Amino acid sequence: MAPPAPGPASGGSGEVDELFDVKNAFYIGSYQQCINEAQRVKPSSPERDVERDVFLYRAYLAQRKYGVVLDEIKPSSAPELQAVRMFAEYLASDSRRDAIVAELDREMSRSVDVTNTTFLLMAASIYFYDQNPDAALRTLHQGDSLECMAMTVQILLKLDRLDLARKELKKMQDQDEDATLTQLATAWVSLAAGGEKLQDAYYIFQEMADKCSPTLLLLNGQAACHMAQGRWEAAEGVLQEALDKDSGHPETLINLVVLSQHLGKPPEVTNRYLSQLKDAHRSHPFIKEYRAKENDFDRLVLQYAPSA
């Protein structure tokens, strides 16, 4: 298992991180294990108590259990926990999202405590969900933690800026090349680079799954490597394993939509995965884009329909 990352996320002095198992489980997407570890560990200081709770509640968010976070984080809770609550409010209420973003804009225009890594991560997450990657990147660049850099890498790759993602990864490697987050970011960059790097990415995902747990994040990473190499049947096996773990996981369903098309499966198979995705994640960016394409197609059909 990788040693703990130095810096704000782990105390920064190179000593053994008492919250390493909590963080590591969260980073690889093993959210229930993260919750279990967080409830088991006894932190040595009030500051570490807050840090543990941050990961505990972020794991609940990842499980879409927004009510737990909203019920348990009080107005008197630490600023780091208030940031997690802000993200929970955003995720839980479609109708309040614009107001939450407007309030966040006002907060970002004032002096921001850049040592509050959790606030930077939650603010960047809100901006990214709100389809404002530029604001997300500006927010993350104010922090110097490995987690801020890892999220920066993810966003840059989604923007097809592999060149900038490589530079950010180099900064992570300089800080701690063995950290779990650095290894994951290395796999993401290798996957985006393609070619011979695909096998490197696959080995990272596979090794983490073997050492820790074959989580949905790691299984989808393996499947993406298989698909990029044209190994569709191998990808199907991995994605079925992921589907068995969670039949409503959005990335798994999206990958199965792509896979079904390439394997020439009947249209109803693809439509079934799309329907599951629409039911469970109607505001997912993929679904929003898919519906926009459907509307564009309908307009074109009307435009070229023969007049009576």
From Swiss-Prot:
Q: How is it modified after translation?
A: Polyubiquitinated by RCHY1 in the presence of androgen, leading to proteasomal degradation.
Please give the function described in this protein's UniProt entry.
Answer: The coatomer is a cytosolic protein complex that binds to dilysine motifs and reversibly associates with Golgi non-clathrin-coated vesicles, which further mediate biosynthetic protein transport from the ER, via the Golgi up to the trans Golgi network. The coatomer complex is required for budding from Golgi membranes, and is essential for the retrograde Golgi-to-ER transport of dilysine-tagged proteins.
> Can you tell me which family this protein belongs to?
Belongs to the COPE family.
GO CC annotations?
COPI vesicle coat; Golgi membrane; nucleoplasm
- This one is known as Coatomer subunit epsilon
One of its Pfam families is: Coatomer_E
Instruction: Name any one GO molecular function.
Output: structural molecule activity
State the encoding gene: COPE
Quaternary context: Oligomeric complex that consists of at least the alpha, beta, beta', gamma, delta, epsilon and zeta subunits.
Q: Which Gene3D superfamilies does the protein's record reference?
A: Tetratricopeptide repeat domain
Do the record's keywords include Transport? yes
Q: How does it sit in the membrane?
A: Peripheral membrane protein
- Statement: the UniProt record of this protein carries the keyword Cell membrane: no
Xref: PANTHER family: COATOMER SUBUNIT EPSILON
Mark the transmembrane ranges: none
Task: For this entry, list what GO says about its biological process.
Answer: endoplasmic reticulum to Golgi vesicle-mediated transport; intra-Golgi vesicle-mediated transport; protein localization to axon; protein transport; retrograde vesicle-mediated transport, Golgi to endoplasmic reticulum
Question: What are the record keywords, sorted?
Answer: Cytoplasm, Cytoplasmic vesicle, ER-Golgi transport, Golgi apparatus, Membrane, Phosphoprotein, Protein transport, Transport, Ubl conjugation
Q: Which positions carry Phosphoserine? A: 13, 45
Q: Where in the cell is it found?
A: Cytoplasm; Golgi apparatus membrane; Cytoplasmic vesicle, COPI-coated vesicle membrane
